[in-house]
């Protein structure tokens, strides 16, 4: 591990007192799985964002394809949210369920899009905050010769980093050369959270999605701060689906995988997280407010390129195809150009 990385980790550990996390329930394997309680919050629905010309529109995954909510709303003269921002933290569950029932009972095929042909946007389109967690898997910490953190290591990305399913990251336009993958479980907040307990933390979650914290390692190591290597345009692909929290019984026990050009590079389980979802939400909310639509990248498992011996480190390049998968959340694909 290089000097700047050691400096960053040491600083992160010294900045906060060692007793900042409660002893009980701080590990992923012993955490509660409470469910959201937002009034009229959608339940049992799997959302996507699709592009319609210059617009981003809400879609619902069904056995017949993706229901184009905006088109269905117009056809049935209904009033329902037509963008994911209008759903997260604002409700609309009953209206969406009613619209979905009408669409499924209809013989109209034009209400549904073939997922294989749909143009996906990020499944969350306008988060106020994109919070990321470093070294949050035990085996990932080991492969990078880093100590297991005693409190979460946080950094951030920006909205310009958002990308969607089948999106493209233009690495050939970047000054960096050492590009790496990081498949991650992403938490999407559904209620405002400030100083919430671990016990109540998951009741503030809207849903979960698959993400990849795409990273430029050479820029990450420029200084003790990781931002340059983490905030590249398009470096936060998420999706294709946003699955409501009621459909995820335990986010701390999900299979997680990343493939590069069809080759499995990462294969693990979120049970290896050092700090599980309730701990992360509670910890973050002690220091700043999490709002509906904010997203949390929860860390990556072992298998990243930077964890290989130096003589085996073959960095990602233009033309590579990446596939990230979380159990029950869908398969996120993107490519490099």
Residue spans for each PLM region:
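N-terminal non-catalytic cap/leader segment that marks the start of a structured domain
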Residues: 5, 12, 29-152, 321-323
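A generic local secondary-structure boundary/capping motif
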Residues: 35-39, 48, 120-122, 142-145, ...
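Catalytic-pocket segment enriched in acidic/His residues
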Residues: 36, 170, 217-337
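Short acidic-glycine loop/turn motifs at beta-strand connectors
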Residues: 60-65, 189-191, 261-262, 326-328
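Structural signature of FAD isoalloxazine-binding scaffolds in flavoprotein oxidoreductases
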Residues: 61, 146-165, 181, 318-327
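Residue-level recognition of short, solvent-exposed, well-ordered loop/turn junctions
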Residues: 125, 132, 180-182, 291, ...
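Short, structured patches in soluble enzyme cores that scaffold and shape functional sites
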Residues: 135, 157-159, 166, 173, ...
